[in-house]
């Protein structure tokens, strides 16, 4: 009896061990990458569907009104570009200094082709995906020698965190001016960091030329992305041992600083925030630095309190990255983890500086860029610290086999994260996916589409010079729309009228 019982126990243990081993083998990093990819792209589907409902709004019409009228009367791209330059010059004198962004503002797709606004959210989300992957791929595949899908899973997790809890979906996708002012420079920044790494690896000067062009565009667009790239250049200059080789970074750095100088000193900036407030002072700069560091720390706590699921995904990034890095060719030394983490926090905190220094009310753009930079710098810090630990373990010959780690850590972490998703399911309701699905399912998206079509039938009728529009309901879901109101002198009313060539635009109520 005793032997039979022992045999049965051993058989059960072997079966359980076999099952766990098979499960661990089945849940590979590649399958995790596929699952995360499916989750990310599935979460973006309702947002891309709403792209075909989204319409231009407010400033979208204002900046491109003259370009649209020029196109209608001439159908000449050259004339439209000339008009765009005139609008840019005017706006830099009276309102804002981001000259490159303003020029792109004037070229809104809708200025050329009716119902082409869907291009904005679809193209720029795809551009964000491609640029983020390009940068991560350069590090994970070309520097660490990992497989493409190992960098892919990190990329997808970064994008999933960003888009699902984005502070402003309008800035991220549905407001043309917001997308061009914030997302376009960030896409360029990701590419430029990739170009920088590419140059260091290949010594091909064309990547410096690309970087010069990119920095000119960023310097004329966004302080946030300019800071991000400039901080990256400084970091790489310090890290690279061959200073003569690293000195080539001076070309894109100076190009960006010159472009940024023209943006900062444009008269429109002073007009926008009250003249003397744009003046430089050492005291104000010191206050801005201290306050930016404080605000950065406070908002990290706020992210933790308001979106704990974000930190669950960051934990999963750490788990997956460790397994991938355990087989990486870690030629980089990872000597100073504390300094790296501190520097990354400084880069993140720097995103608060422009709004603090200007001391003026801002749109949802700064909060969106601060959040995105927090994700990027946190992931960077996690990977650096893990690289440092792995280098230490390698030197001491105590590094565990990847198979053991995968079975004992990665696979359980998958299930732990799934359980935590249930625990923090309230955050799922805060996600952009849930918001978009609710907006579509409730019928509000269809109502918005019908209301926009009703207004546009009147606005596109050239025989009508005084347009009386039915008012829209305030339910916009994740979309971004500044409605026409009763007052014909209101900003939105005037710019819509200018875009469509109307003498007056108002509502029937």
Go through each PLM region and give its residues.
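Intrinsically disordered, polar/acidic, low-complexity terminal segments
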Residues: 3-6, 16-96, 109-152, 243-245, ...
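Transmembrane catalytic cores of multi-pass membrane glycosyltransferases
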Residues: 46-111, 116-118, 176, 223-366
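Transmembrane alpha-helical segments
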Residues: 128-140, 188-200, 230-238, 316-321, ...
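Membrane-interface micro-motifs in multi-pass membrane enzymes
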Residues: 147-197, 350-383
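Short hydrophobic alpha-helices at membrane interfaces in multi-pass membrane enzymes
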Residues: 198-217, 247-250
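Transmembrane helices and adjacent periplasmic/lumenal helix-loop junctions
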Residues: 209-236, 422
């Amino acid at each position: 009896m005793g032997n039979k019982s022992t045999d049965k126990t051993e058989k059960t243990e072997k079966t359980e061990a076999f099952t766990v081993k098979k499960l661990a083998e089945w849940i590979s990093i590649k399958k995790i990458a596929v699952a995360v990819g499916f989750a990310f792209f599935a979460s973006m589907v309702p947002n891309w569907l709403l792209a075909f409902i989204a319409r231009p709004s407010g400033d979208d019409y204002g900046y491109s009104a003259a370009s649209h009228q020029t196109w209608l009367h001439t159908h000449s791209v050259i004339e439209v570009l000339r008009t765009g330059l005139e609008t840019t010059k005017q706006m830099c004198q009276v309102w804002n200094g981001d000259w490159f962004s303003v020029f792109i503002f004037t070229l809104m797709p809708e200025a050329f082709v009716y119902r082409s606004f869907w291009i904005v959210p679809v193209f720029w989300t795809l551009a964000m995906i491609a640029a983020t992957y390009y940068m991560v791929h350069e590090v994970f595949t070309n520097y660490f020698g990992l497989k493409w899908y190992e960098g892919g899973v990190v990329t997808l997790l970064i994008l999933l965190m960003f888009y699902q809890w984005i502070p402003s979906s309008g800035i991220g996708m549905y407001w043309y001016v917001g997308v061009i002012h914030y997302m376009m420079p960030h896409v360029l920044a990701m590419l430029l960091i990739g170009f920088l790494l590419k140059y260091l690896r290949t010594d091909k000067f064309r990547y410096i030329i690309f970087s010069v062009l990119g920095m000119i565009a960023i310097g004329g667009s966004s302080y946030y992305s300019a800071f991000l790239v400039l901080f990256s250049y400084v970091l790489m200059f310090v890290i690279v041992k061959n200073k003569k080789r690293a000195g080539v970074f001076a070309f894109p750095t100076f190009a960006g600083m010159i472009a940024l100088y023209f943006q900062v000193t444009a008269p429109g900036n002073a007009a926008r925030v009250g003249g003397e407030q744009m003046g430089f002072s050492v005291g104000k700069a010191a206050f801005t630095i201290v306050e930016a560091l404080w605000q950065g720390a406070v908002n990290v706590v706020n992210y933790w309190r308001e979106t704990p699921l974000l930190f669950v995904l960051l934990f999963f990034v750490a788990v997956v990255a460790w397994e991938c890095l355990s087989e990486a060719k870690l030629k980089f030394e990872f000597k100073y983890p504390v300094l790296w983490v501190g520097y990354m926090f400084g880069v993140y905190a720097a995103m608060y500086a422009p709004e603090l220094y200007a001391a003026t009310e801002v749109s949802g753009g700064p909060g969106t860029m601060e959040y995105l930079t927090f994700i990027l710098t946190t992931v960077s810090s996690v990977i650096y610290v893990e690289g440092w630990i792995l280098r230490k373990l390698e030197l001491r010959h105590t590094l565990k086999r990847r198979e053991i780690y995968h079975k004992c850590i990665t696979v359980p972490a998958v299930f732990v994260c799934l359980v935590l998703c249930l625990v923090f399911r309230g955050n799922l309701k805060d996600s952009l996916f849930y918001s978009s699905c609710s907006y579509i399912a409730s019928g509000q998206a269809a109502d918005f589409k019908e209301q926009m079509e009703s207004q546009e039938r009147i606005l596109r009728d050239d025989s009508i010079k005084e347009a009386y529009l039915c008012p829209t309901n305030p339910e916009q879901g994740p979309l971004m729309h500044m409605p026409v109101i009763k007052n014909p002198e209101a900003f939105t009313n005037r710019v819509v009228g200018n875009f469509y060539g109307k003498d007056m635009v108002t509502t029937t109520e």
